[in-house]
Amino acid sequence: MPHSRQPSISSSIMSQSNHNHPQKIGPWKLGKTLGRGATGRVLLATHQTTGQKAAVKVVSKSELQDEETEKNGDGLPYGIEREIIIMKLLTHPNVLRLYDVWETSKALYLVLEYVEGGELFDLLVERGPLPEVEAIKYFRQIILGTAYCHALGICHRDLKPENLLLDSQLNVKLADFGMAALESNGKLLETSCGSPHYAAPEIVSGLKYHGAASDVWSCGVILFALLTGRLPFDDENIRNLLLKVQAGNFEMPVDEVSREARDLIARMLEVDPMRRISTEKILRHPLLTKYPMSNEDLISEKSLPHPQTGYKSLGSVRNIDKQILSNLTILWNDRPEEEIVDCLLKDGSNPEKTFYALLMRYKHNQEDNTNNNSPKKSTSFNNKVVRSGSKYSLNGTPRRKRASHISVSRPTSFQYKSNPGAGATANRNSVARHSVASSANNSPRKSPYKSPYRSPYRSPYKSPSKRYSYNQSPTKSPYGRRSNSQRQFENEPLKAKPRNIYNEIVDAQSNFSLPPSLPPSLPSKDSRYMIDEPNQPQLQQPALSQVPENPIVDESPDLMQSAKISSGKRNSIIGKNNNNSNSNKRMSKRKSIRASMTTGLKRNSITMKLLSTYAKLSGDDDWEYMDKQTKRTSATFAALCDKIFNQEDYDEEDEQLVDPEEKEAKEYERLMELERKKHEAELKARRELEKKKRRQKRRSILSSKKLSIIVKNDADPNNSEQELVDEGIKQPKRQSKNLTALRALSEGNHASEELTLEDVENLKRRSASQPVPKRRQTPVLTRRPVSRLDPLWQAHENEQLDRAKDALEQEWRDSQKRSSTVSRKKVNRESMISVMDDIVEEDQGRVNRRSTRNTYYERERDYELPEPTVEDSNLTDDYMTEIRKSRLLNSQLNVRDPLNEKRKSEPKTLISNVQIPSVTRKSRNFTTSNKRLSVLSMYSTKESYRDLNSIINSPDENPEQHQNMNKPALRTSIADRLDKAGLAEPEYETETDGEDKVSVIDLDDHLADRRTSYYDGSGKRASRASTTKRYNVHSSSGQRPKSKVPDLPKNDYDDTFVSNSDEVHKRQYKSMVSDESSASDDVFDKIKLPDGKSTKSSIDELANGTSTSGHRKPKIRHSQPGPEMLIPHLNGGIESSQPMSKVRGNNSSGHDDSVPPPPPAHKVNKKPLDDKTNFPPPEVDPKRKGSFFRKLSWGSKKTIENNTNAATNTTTQQQLPSPAESKEEKPKSSFFRWFSSSNTPSAAEIRKFNTILPKHEMSTALFALLNSWSNFGLKDLRNDQVGYYITGAISKHNSFNLKSCKFRIKINQRDFNQKSEIVCVRVKGSKVTTDTLFSEIEKVLLKEGVLDK
């Protein structure tokens, strides 16, 4: 039968999704989660008796059961149990101990040794490369633990620093045998498991491999990491990493490590597993012999099993220990003995040989310990055997398997490699070992390692305290007290047992296993009941006749051991009184005499006691699960564990273990009793309360009569309430006592009921609003007015009215907020206006809801967090960036509360009336007296180039030149447009001098190019392409400053479409379209322009702090902002980068350069262009600031740019032609191209505006304007560049609570296309909405100065 790879607890992948673990597992109380791994969660557990800590690994059984269905060989439990026994039998100072194993219906709980030192990985991370001497100390212990496992045919297969734990003394413990495998019958392992950085090439390649060799590779990687602080194979890409491992390619650290270390690493990281060094040779390598070894490590090495222990054949059947063979038979579920013998005689590794070696080593260790301890009181081995987890009591009464744990302990020594038997005290924990005279030494509670691994069949209440106590007290070892006579039979051959002896054994066993006072389903074990009732065993004897005959009885060699059941020893360990112990000793003595007359009984035999009893039960596996309690997994496994790893002594709790159903019934009765008492207490409390109320009512009536100031009917309830409060203080002592008792019984219910009347009154008064402060001291406020004659009536009535009014107002506000903000959020998530509106409205709602309490604090908050003042302040680029960021994103609290107050006080206005703050931005081109364009113009500035001349001269021929151009970039709704244009978002860098920046216009240009490329002529596309190219090349060079600001009201026109309801925006951002104070009217008058020229583009440059030369103060700018700025700006993109020697006021005829005209005549001595557009417009737009048409003007700028390219390549300054003159060139990258879209118009109402821009420029600019409003609800925009009309719609989910509508705008030419006419028509929908939209458009055109008056 193939047993090579049974379903493995550890190899199964557990997913313990639910956290419904029992609060305790046996004696272990589960605590916090220590971590999670591939095999499940690890919990910290504390022993309830000793306080010992352990780590409990929770393993889900669902995967195990799946594996069981796949493996029909041995069935699930046996494979798991074999692995558990292996882990229990692995007793080595450098291997983490397994103490107990418990199971519920859903999970297995592996109780492991808890080490406080953490992982070796953490040590490496914290300290980096270790000194060689320290690294070798850890490495030697890793190899010792690994060699120990390999000698027994066990491979870890997942060695890595994370699985190497350190105890408090910084000794290494191999942990997490989750991938561990038994090499079976010399077969190679096939599972590719482990961690990629530490996995061997053969595992990575998916080849069959020897587990031992793969562990050596992992140890080599660990050695490399210990010495260098890094891994030999590492790569971010897992595939590349695996390829490196497969090829064995790594860089040997020459300078960092010694020659010996390099040699060992090279031999361990050998790709060919056949040539890889073995653990035995590693221990003899010069690197390890170079440094002295600690005594513990020396002892550990000397006590290692022979490397071939798990591999070599046992030679002949004569060499096979019959007792161990019988153990193996039971472990493999009564597998034929011949098959097991065949496996033991084969060469090579197999599980049978591994178990044989482990058990033999265990047996020798027991004998060594026995010889080292003087015999104490005779204690029977079988008194432990009776505590097996068999399902049936020995008298034939079926029992549930009790919750218990695997108390399999680990052998201390095997056949020692050098000196068999010498290593009994060899390991670090040898103190414990030699103090134990028998296998009890290895039982979990007696385990020197305090191994929490216990047999799943053991009682849940076994105390691991013995794990400690045995370390100090050898006398507590059951085997330490064993008589020499018990040992004399150990080596006798197995003999058949007569039936009468078997009956006697079962008789004695059952007497102790089932005291009559306990339910028949109790686990079989001698208990303290036997001490108190020494005659009870005789009561149970008749039941023995019911025990069915067991055909194996006559062949079982060790039955008589069970006849000697000495609870005295156990009781002495548990701490029972000496009298009881003595009586039990006498009983044990009698049984020992009877046993001594039986031939062939070995008292200290390593074989399982009562083998036949368990064999009888081994075929029956219909055991039950108990969710609340844990249990052993199978009868045969219990047999093996009980026999081999002697049962421990039990605590008193152990003896009280009852049937789960009975326990459940008792618990239910207890709860019901509690409920009944509670109910009775509540009834009593209520009755007392009623009596009390009646007494108080009588007193209140009497007192009200005495006072004679109130009407009786009204007075009763109120006075009774008042009296009730007083009475709570002045109660008679008797009453108070009763109430206290009742209150305790009713668990606090009574106390709450005492306040019922008062609470009701308070609730009545507070029903309309939030609670108000209670002033119980004054009777005026503790009662309601009795009648209209009561002096309190007026105050009370006013208070009620105020609260009702507040509640209604709040209700109205909430409904308004819900109706407005929900729809706004639905569509306009990017609109900062709606976002800030929501923020402020929500905050406002909270303030209003708390108005009765927080009014004072609101006022205080206004002073604590005043609205930041930005007007007329000089701010650096960085500071402006931070202001924009914090105002809009990170510091909303700073503006919320002041805004809330302002919002209440400020009148509702259109956005066109909002003041724009004048904020200056410092750069080396600005003095402190120079005002920056408005803050928002920073966002709306479309484009300014520093070296337009070179661009004009070679727009497409020299793209590399564009990389050298530093263009200011201001963030408008750039991210939105980038998304729409499919253009990668540029990198922004904030620069204080503001010089190396790219204008958003490039982006807008790119968008416009995409939108209108179909209609554009090749000339237009060329112009736009050059712009886009400049932009792209430049952005790739990293010149474009990256704005740290989130997308703000991205430009002036982003903010223009603000309705009355958008108060936040008005208060917070002061839209750039709004009128400004006279102080800001002359913004442009104070801007110094470069000597070369002053186009609008140059103004943009100045605004962005990007102009390279000084500026003169313009004097005329404020008189006619619109046309002058537009046209120059249209040309401005071309000129801005050139030295600005000429001002806007010059006649266009006076200049023949390729440079467009500057912005408004900033110098009086220069004449404006002849075109009427160059005359100062009426003071319509005193603030040229956030001019949305700066984008507009860019359209003409582009055209002129092309003009000048075609006309001349000279760099002399020349005034720009008027818009009329440049009309044919302008189609190319008109700024309004941004906003184009179209929808179907219908004649509802017509609005016409005459503008001074040519038709194509106006079309592009207007489309750009509308497009920028898309965040606020405009949608479906279409721009027909052939027919020059724009169609669009306003969504019903707009930011301003306007109704939806559709509109159409047609641009017609005038004056030979030097000017244009805008015709706005409502197609369908709300007339109010279209009127609002057209009015906003008109305001923007007016502000920009492009309306032709």
Swiss-Prot record:
It is an enzyme of class 2 (transferase). It comes from the Eukaryota. Residues 1-20, 369-384, 443-470, 570-585, 1202-1215 have a biased composition (Low complexity). Keywords: Apoptosis, ATP-binding, Coiled coil, Cytoplasm, Kinase, Nucleotide-binding, Phosphoprotein, Serine/threonine-protein kinase, Transferase. Its EC number is 2.7.11.1. GO terms for biological process: apoptotic process; exit from mitosis; filamentous growth; filamentous growth of a population of unicellular organisms; filamentous growth of a unicellular organism; G2/M transition of mitotic cell cycle; negative regulation of filamentous growth; regulation of cell growth. Residues 28-288 form the Protein kinase domain. Disruption phenotype: Leads to hyperinvasive cells. The keyword Zinc does not apply. The active site is at residue 158. The keyword Chloroplast does not apply. InterPro entries: Fungal_KA1_dom (IPR031850), KA1_sf_fungal (IPR043024), Kinase-like_dom_sf (IPR011009), Prot_kinase_dom (IPR000719), Protein_kinase_ATP_BS (IPR017441), Ser/Thr_kinase_AS (IPR008271). ATP binds at residues 34-42, 57. Its main location: cytoplasm. PROSITE patterns: PROTEIN_KINASE_ATP, PROTEIN_KINASE_DOM, PROTEIN_KINASE_ST. It is found in: Cytoplasm; Bud neck. Belongs to the protein kinase superfamily. CAMK Ser/Thr protein kinase family. NIM1 subfamily. This is Serine/threonine-protein kinase GIN4. The gene is GIN4.
